[in-house]
Amino acid sequence: MDEESVSNGSLFSKFEGEETMGKVLLFSIVSIFTGILFLLLLHLYARLFWWRVEQHFNLNLIQSDDPGSTVIGRNPRRRRFVFAQSQEDPLHNAGLDSKILQSIHVVVFKCTDFKDGLECAVCLSDLVDGDKARVLPRCNHGFHVDCIDMWFQSHSTCPLCRNTVGSVEDTTHGGSEGLPQNQNFESGHSTNQHNPSQDQSFVHEFSTEPLSFPTNVLVWGDQNQVRSAGLVVTEESPSGNFAASYNDHQQESSSTRSQEVTAVVVDIPDNSSENLSERIDEEEPKSPMFTRLRLLKNVLSREKTNNNNV
């Protein structure tokens, strides 16, 4: 009897331990699934909340009558940029005049008007139907209204081509806008040789045109002054004979209205691959491996010649 009671007690305690372990395991599994469900519901709530915020911004933007509205949040996939004003010289960070900015027309983008589409270079996202965009008059580059407005708060040039932005009226009535920069410069220089009294007016006309360099030239400087090969061109040109200052490449040009900034121009030759191949051809005869191969080729050619003679 004693042995049976002991065996029954051990079995009862064993079953009781297994039952406790099962309850603990069940409670752990239920707790884990409850936590996962709570996180999933929290994620869905957050997505719904931000979706309502985006819809609110879109509604305010559509109802706004201001074409230059800078409300952020029209497209959830758009990158948001804030161009903060730095504490540098205001002459170097002068933004575009508000009158010129307002004179640039605002258009509504349509995919049918642009077969290849249109990408905003400021936020790096494509324009979709219904987006408001500004098309710059001189270079015909288009950008989002809010993006280009923030850009022009600290810049006065196009983000893509760096050409100076002017009003639509100036672009329409400008006589020399369609000429390339080098042709305009050469024609104006020859005119100044025949009529020196128009030197100062020609300098002012030439300085308003944006400088254009080839794609293989790197230029450093500010947007008001660029110096290359001794020739200095500024927006605020000093008084004097332009032809004389152009011919004298060694003389330093100075201006009382604009600071002189040194420009570093690095010319990258286009025929770099050809020069590299020529250099390799010149270095190959100097290598010992090439010399051995040439000697072996000569020996084989001699043996072949002897066999043919026999």
From Swiss-Prot:
GO CC, one annotated term: membrane
Chain positions of all zinc fingers (RING-type): 120-162
Coarse class of the protein's main subcellular location: membrane
SUPFAM superfamilies associated with the record: RING/U-box (SSF57850)
Entries under InterPro entries matching the protein: ATL1/ATL16-like (IPR044600), Znf_RING (IPR001841), Znf_RING/FYVE/PHD (IPR013083)
Domain notes from UniProt: The RING-type zinc finger domain mediates binding to an E2 ubiquitin-conjugating enzyme.
Homology family: Belongs to the RING-type zinc finger family. ATL subfamily.
Protein name in UniProt: RING-H2 finger protein ATL60
Organism: Arabidopsis thaliana
